[in-house]
Amino acid sequence: MEDNSFLKLSKKIEKILEKNDYLKKKVEQLTKSVDNHEFKIQELLLLLRKNNIHPTTTTTTTTTTNNNSTCVGISNSPPLSPRTSTDSMTNSNNSSATSSTTPSPTQTSTITTTSQIDPNSLTNSNNSFIPINSPISQTTVNNNNNNNNNNNNNNNNNNNNNNNNNNNNLNNQTITSPLSTSSSNSNSNSNSSSPIVSPVSSPQLSGSGNRPRIQFLGNGRMPSTGNLFKKEDSSDSLLKYSKDSEHLYIVPTTPRPSKSPSMDFIASTSLINTVSSNNTDSTNNDNSSILNDQQNQQQNQQQQNQQQQQEEINFITTEDKLPNLPDSNCQWAIIWEYSANDDEWTKALIIVEIDAKPFAKGALRNAYQLKIRSNAMQCFNHFATPIHEKYMEGKKLNLSQIPKLNQNLSLDTLYVAKDSKTSVNFNRYFEDVKMQMVCKSYGERYNSNHPPKKIEFLSAWVIEIQGTTNYRVGNRNSSNNTLYGLELFMKGEFKKQNSNFGTVFTERNTPQSFSHFTYECTTHEMVVVDIQGVDDIYTDPQVHTKDGKGYGEGNLGQKGIEKFLISHKCSPICLQFGLPPIGLETGRNAHRVIRGTMLLPDLTPDLYEPEYPLIENQPSNPLNSELTSIVHLSGHDERVCSLLINQDKTKLYSASADGYVKIWNLTNNEDLSKIQMIDSFRAHRRSIEKMLLNEKYLFTASSDGTIKIWSLPTTTTTTTTSKQSSSSSSSSYECIGKLEDHTAEVNDMCIDIENNFLVSCSFDKQIKIYDLSTFKCIKSLNAHGKSIKSIYMSGKYLFSSSNDQSIKIWDLEMCMCVYGMNDAHDAPITSLRMFGNRLFSASKDGEIKDWNLSTFQPTTTLDQHNMAITDILVTSNGYLFVSSDDSTIRIIDISNQNEPIKIISSTKAHRSGVNSLATDGKRIFSGGCDNLIKVWNWKNK
């Protein structure tokens, strides 16, 4: 009901805003402001949960007159939600406080506030404040009668003296919220009041002064009934709205807690000590004990001493307290680090060793190798100069923290320091570092959506090397301090993926999809381009913002965004993230994104190549070789549809169109022609199209639409070949399960060993995924427009082919199609196999294509079969054995990837079509439509 009401209200508001441009702008400004505060509150709540702290608020107001107690107001507030207004909290509590009107002269008031803050958790190893999100303070207002027997005469006198002050405090209470920690402790013996930390405005992120608006929603996708690549189990809940006929999509992302404290929550050391002391006093005395003035003075003195000691530790300002430089090549340097989460800078002092000459020179900058020889120290005041204040003009500087740098790296880690060849303003260095750290933050959000390949932007810093009189850097006297941009040194081939002006230099999809992600993630306010680096570790990006503000001179504003939109070509990663296709008006055109879009260059390292059988007795001259028949195995009454050899190559399984499975003994290695049937049973009432084995089970797929699971016998049972012994009652194989989720004949199967999944395809146009631990179907994919004839698994990717003449590639982790080619063949595709970085497909018209998975283009096409190709056997020697309905077996040489594939041998194997092939490394087995299994030897002519 709330969702329907919200939608109706939203429609009404949109209609009003369409007629009033001024009001529309005001609403947008208000929305951005609310999002900024809500983002901070979400970060705060995450930190609360992380520290197992549950915010609670209890406010009790009691008025007692002449020993008669009257309850004025008791309220127990629930934990604050991110949308709870601080103003509403203040109003509600003020009304409660006002309800206890001015007490009579015989009354006394005591305001006691306890805040559940652990004093030990407020400082870190650097003696700097770590902001924790404390629970809501419990504020109790007690009005005690002057004749209370629990208080002595002195306490009564003190209470009377402080009566007026307490009344004032009653009307001016500070109500704490998750955004601030307020604590006041006033009693008859205390003359000190604790300072109050009030919330300040949320820091801004972007150069234009507005943090990019990001909605943290669940996975969504474009509503489209014609999109084959839409997840079945996803909901069309993606938030979108229309503005000037332009659809804006909010990308599903995951909120992350701030990794470093914000200025919103930073307090001085004296405040921390005071709060800690007050909380400790209130807790130990059960909110009612009264300390005398002498004890308070002693505590105040101790606090001052502790504060002075901490200041001496945190800020070393005298020259004799600086450590000595390790050697003459080292120098002092001040380093600045930017936090994109908090929009603030921290700085520290470090020791660096920088090369005198640059190891690389670009058009605009020089690059020097540098090593950091010390941990970050807070004694930067030793080198304080007026220029440092100019550096931080318009920026937030958090002096209570120091840069984190890369804490897990050794002191021998190489960095790159970059300076400009020409004279530039110091802001250029700070803008570049800020821009790279903002892009790093967006890269982390991109990775949280589980792309095929993750990315990373290098962390960056600004350093100022302090000048000396006897050291020169880059042939320039460094008596004037020199600024550098600093980042980690990258090894590898440096490539530029796209440019600031929209040019795309590579076919890789990951960089382009990241740029598209940033464009949608910020609701079209900005885009990250100029992506370059080693593999998917990037540096030196450029940001274009809609208003053209911030991010240096390279920010081309709306013009730069338009250049990206013109050159961008969506990829399946964009579809995976639910990003609207750029340049396509409706989701029904989304299939155009797939065609011709190169995704596989990103995925080929993740493909897995199985262990193909090795032909041990390969002829010495394969180009002049042939297949010779060794023996014919009879026993089936109908055509042999499938052949399978077990892992240890001791058994041959054959299945036929009458539903029978027969097992043959292959252990006689002395005479390869002696092969005996050892078991037989009827598995199905109709034809068996495919068999599979794992360590425990035999799987049979049939044209009756079922898959049966058979337990493997523990011992070998010898059975005669007579038909009387061929009944299932005498077999040692027992059916332990049947999968009946398909509605038509099951054509092919494969096993995902790593995840223990069974994948099947059927005439019903569906791919089904089964969990072998439960034998339950966990996912169904509406994969093709016609019957699916063949599937092949490699790593986490599944290849499927269909009678609709298409080949599709599926990511089984996401259960979605990541690539598709609609016209791979001119006829139904019957078989798929892989060898190295190549995919082989065969069709009903007798054509074989060799596809390069780096470009997904066919490199060779063979068209020498007269009828449909039924099976392909791949060997590790680099040969394909191909069976066909034209009754032949052809051998194709694929060993040289740089040369076209070619047929080296052709044999008429059966009287009619050949349906299946298998090998144990010594012999080739073929099953035909003539009900025979033939055994072949490959040898020289």
UniProtKB/Swiss-Prot annotation:
One of its GO terms (cellular component) is actomyosin contractile ring. Residues 57-234, 276-310 are annotated as: Disordered. Keywords: ATP-binding, Coiled coil, Kinase, Nucleotide-binding, Repeat, Serine/threonine-protein kinase, Transferase, WD repeat. It catalyses: L-threonyl-[myosin heavy-chain] + ATP = O-phospho-L-threonyl-[myosin heavy-chain] + ADP + H(+). GO terms for molecular function: ATP binding; myosin heavy chain kinase activity; protein serine/threonine kinase activity. It holds the Pfam family Alpha_kinase. Its EC number is 2.7.11.7. WD repeats lie at residues 635-674, 683-720, 741-780, 783-820, 824-861, 864-902, 909-941. Residues 8-48, 289-317 form a coiled coil. Residues 57-70, 84-115, 124-206 have a biased composition (Low complexity). SUPFAM superfamilies: Protein kinase-like (PK-like) (SSF56112), WD40 repeat-like (SSF50978). It is an enzyme of class 2 (transferase). The keyword Kinase applies. One of its GO terms (biological process) is response to differentiation-inducing factor 1. Residues 337-582 form the Alpha-type protein kinase domain. Belongs to the protein kinase superfamily. Alpha-type protein kinase family. ALPK subfamily. Phosphorylates threonine. Not critical for regulating the assembly and disassembly of myosin II filament. This is Myosin heavy chain kinase D. It comes from Dictyostelium discoideum. The lineage of its organism: Eukaryota, Amoebozoa, Evosea, Eumycetozoa, Dictyostelia. The gene is mhkD.
